[in-house]
């Protein structure tokens, strides 16, 4: 379950005078179901409860913490972000880009299904680059099966993990950033994509609406 919460409780039990500050990104219990979800919720509740203060980078997570632990010392401290915007625009029309670890929470299944349900005319010219770690082999194979099912072999490319320099080139030539994540505590990659002038298509859930504003930047 959550090792961080266990460690916080350990320090508070054996070092009661120690002030533990926690930087909290998102709640892991939201990714679970059944008894695991209940146990994880309890661990996070305990961990936050014995913390001296909690720092969080997003109003969404801040509100959840206050619901869980109304008496907690919680500070919303927005994440600093510095990124040089490219001076030239060399995007490729209909070039879509996703950046993030390839696993279930990122919702790529829904993105591939959406493209797969397009007509041949609507798909024409579209290409999707999926950039990110592919270590979750079971989920990766599931996505490959979906690509094969919909005949998207020439449309979808799994790039894998790349260097920062290579990533900049992918951002520079992308026409639109797509991010079908089901849960985000912040979604820094959204800010990164916007720094390249990319419009963002994303689900309206968790912390995402605090960054992506409909008809303004996505």
Residue ranges and their predicted role:
Residues 205-215:
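Short acidic/histidine- and often glycine-rich active-site loop of Leloir-type glycosyltransferases
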Residues 94, 101-117, 128, 138-141:
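A conserved mid-protein helix/loop that constitutes part of the nucleotide-sugar donor-binding site
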Residues 60, 80:
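Carbohydrate-associated surface elements
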Residues 182:
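Aromatic "clamp/platform" in nucleotide-sugar-dependent glycosyltransferases that forms part
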């Amino acid at each position: 379950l959550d090792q961080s919460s266990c460690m916080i409780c350990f320090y508070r039990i054996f070092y009661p005078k120690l002030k533990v500050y926690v930087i909290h990104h998102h709640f892991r219990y939201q990714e679970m179901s059944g008894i695991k979800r209940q146990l994880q919720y309890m661990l996070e509740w305990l961990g936050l409860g014995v913390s001296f203060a909690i720092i969080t980078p997003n109003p969404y997570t801040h509100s959840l913490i206050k619901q869980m632990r109304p008496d907690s010392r919680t500070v919303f401290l927005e994440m600093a972000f510095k990124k040089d915007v490219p001076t030239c625009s060399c995007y490729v029309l209909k070039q879509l880009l996703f950046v993030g670890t390839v696993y279930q929470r990122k919702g790529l299944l829904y993105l591939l299904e959406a493209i797969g349900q397009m007509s041949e005319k609507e798909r024409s010219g579209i290409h999707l680059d999926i950039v990110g770690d592919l270590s979750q082999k079971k989920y990766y194979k599931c996505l490959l099966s979906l690509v094969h099912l919909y005949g998207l072999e020439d449309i979808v490319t799994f790039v894998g993990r790349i260097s920062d320099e290579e990533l900049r080139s992918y951002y520079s030539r992308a026409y639109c950033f797509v991010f079908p994540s089901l849960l985000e505590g912040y979604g820094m990659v959204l800010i990164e994509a916007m720094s390249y002038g990319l419009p963002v298509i994303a689900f309206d859930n968790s912390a995402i609406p605090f960054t992506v504003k409909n008809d303004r930047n996505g």
